[in-house]
C-alpha cells in the first residue's frame, strides 16, 4: 500500500492515502491516551472528554452546529475511548473532506469544556454507566478484566465509576487534556479520493502549531492476580461466563500465532466453540472468544451466555476445546481455512476509506510503523500447527485461567476457576 507519511516538527504524525476509486473520504485522529492513563480519583476522564468535544468548540460553539455541518453534507462524526487510545473520526463524501478535517481538528484542539455542559453531560454519562451495569453481558466482561488486571486501570470500566464521575470538573478535564493530548501522542490519517499534498498541508495548518509537551509514562501492567474467580449474583434468564488468560503485548512475537489460535477457537460460525457449544450441544446462542493486546500486556477471553442449569456444562465444554488445542496439532485443512479467514478479514477491511484511515492511524500509534498487507499475509502464512500448539500450551494452561460469571446466585456460586484452587468472591447485585 502506497501512502504519504510525515512527522511534523512538534511530533504529530500524519498519514494520507489517495484512493482514486473511492467516492468517500475518512478522517481518523488517534490520540494515545485512554482509561489506562487515569487514577482512582479521575477514572472516567478520557471517556468524559470524548463526550465533551461534541458539545461545542471555539469556532462551532454548540453541538447542533457540529452535527448540522457534518450531516449537512451527508457525513458522520464519531468518537470512541479505549484503554490506550481515544479516537475521533469523520466519514464524508470525498469533496467535503477538508470540512470534516476542520471539524475533527476543532474538536480535538479547542473544545469549550463549559461548566454547564459538563454538568449536563455528566447526567448522560451516569445513565450510560448505569445502563451497562444493568446488563449482565457487559458486567461479566468488566469482572474478567478486574481479575486479569487487579487494582489497575486496565481492569477498570472505561466510562468510570459513578461516584468518581460525579466529582469530575471542567477544570480537571482541561488539565487532563493539556497533559495527555500532546503532539507526540497524536496521529492524523486521511484516506479516500483526496489530493495528498493538499491533505498534508491542511493537517499541517491545523495541528502544526500545537505546543510540545513532555511525555507522561503509563503505569506498568500489573502482575497476574491471585484471585482466580469472581462472580456477581444477579437475577436473569441466563448465566454469563467469561474464561480468561493473560496473553501477550502488541509487539510480542507470539501475537500473530495467538491471533490465529483465537480465530480457530472462537471467531465466527465455523469456530470450534461455536460448532461444539451451539451447533452440537445447543448450549448457547452467543459463544465466542476475543483477544486484546496492549503496550505491555494482553489477554484472550472466552464468553458464553447460557441457561443457568447448564452453565457448568458450558464451562467444561469450552475448557475441553482449549485442552484439545494444547493436546492435538491443528489439522492442515483447518489451518489453511483459518489462515484464509484472517487474511480475508484484513483485505476486506482495506476496501473502503474508513478501514484504510483507521488501519494507518492505528498501526502508526501502536506499532510505530505500518505493516503492509503483503507482510502480514507472509507472517500469517508462516504460522504452522506446531506454533499454535506451542502457544496454547504456554498461555492457555488451566492453572493460568480466570473465571468470571454473572447470573442467578445458586448458579454462579458453583462456578470456580478451572483448577478450583483460588478464592471465590461473591458480589451483591447492584
Predicted features and spans:
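Active/ligand-binding-proximal structured segments within catalytic/core domains
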Residues: 11, 18-70, 253-265, 273-275
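Charge-rich, well-structured scaffold segments of protease-associated domains
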Residues: 2-3, 7, 18, 65-222, ...
